[in-house]
Amino acid sequence: MPAMECVAKKFLKLPNIQKYEVSALTEYGFVAAIEMDDGFEFKIHVYTMQKSYPSSVMQLLEKRGKDKGDCVLVSPYISKRTADICEKNGVGYFDYAGNCWFVGHSIYLSERGNKNLSPERSIASTSIFEQSAVISSLILRELFADINKVWRLKHLSETVKCSIGQVSKVMDFLIKNAWAEKSAEGYYISEPELLLKEWSKTYGKKTVPTYLCYSLDNPSVLEGKLSDLKRDMGIDYYLTGFSGGVRYAPVVRYNKVHVYIAPEDMLEAVAYLGLKEVDSGANVMIFSLENDSYKKDSRIIGEDMVVSPLQVYLDSMQIKGRGEEIAEAVLLKEILK
């Protein structure tokens, strides 16, 4: 049995372990008895899971108090989120790739970085955060419009104008990963910051079609010309990245402009603004406004159209340098308020 083997192998490699043996099989896994070289004996209660969702670990923690002895989770694949929950709560873990963590009884086991050949990422887990998943994106954006709001599935589906099935799929995934919870009143986001960080990782794996341009104007002058572009040509634009972020939280100085413009307006906008397309050294990034989710909850700040704090966060997390700094500032000031 792989679960038994991967735990036994790690413990028996330790020089201070005299004996390790499985003493009982249980409905959840097995119990192993361990004897150290000084004669001290203890037991570990090993829970085996084919899929170790963070929510499953939360349930394991509830059972933990009923068992006398140390608690250990074994699964083919253990995500970083699951590992963090285990470590925070003193639960050991082992996966089939050899990654592990166990602390107790003068024992410290820790091994990370072994690549799992078949990481547990279902189609649903990847598609929910991808830029092409427009409906899922709209559902998530509605949830983040007010992270303190509790939703009924029917109300959320009506608000987003999608099926209850689509909403249910998203909420089930969030609950499995312990980012959302269900109460008697409905569903709500319980770990907004962790959820956003995971979303931003997947979001950044696909690059939005971008015009890389150079302008002789400084950012403030160019952003003023964008306002003129709207007035003179009727072309909508939405500031994001540094340009959008400082409108919400002016914590960084910047020399690059980030803006969304519809793909059909790109060439006309570039010509009006007097920009030159370049392969390197760009100080203007024009992102293609491919779908309406990017501009959901956008607002007018001063004379400029600015994407939502959520979109600023997602875009800024992909910017090298001080992008994460502006993203974090917007997160704290506008999203987690």
Model-inferred region functions:
Residues M1-V91:
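DNA-contacting interfaces and partner/effector-binding or oligomerization modules
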Residues A24-G29, E35-M36, K154, D279-K337:
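C-terminal regulatory/effector modules of DNA-binding transcriptional regulators
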Residues G90-F102:
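Charged, structured surface patches that assemble and position nucleic-acid processing machinery
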Residues S110-L140:
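Short alpha-helical segments that sit at the start of domains
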Residues I139-W199:
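Loop-centered beta-sheet repeat module
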Residues L196, T202-V208:
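A compositional/biophysical signature of low hydrophobicity enriched in polar/charged and small residues
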Residues K206-D292:
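Short gly/ser-rich loop at a beta-strand->alpha-helix junction or flexible surface loop bordering the NTP-binding
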Residues V103-I107:
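Short, charged, surface-exposed secondary-structure boundary motifs
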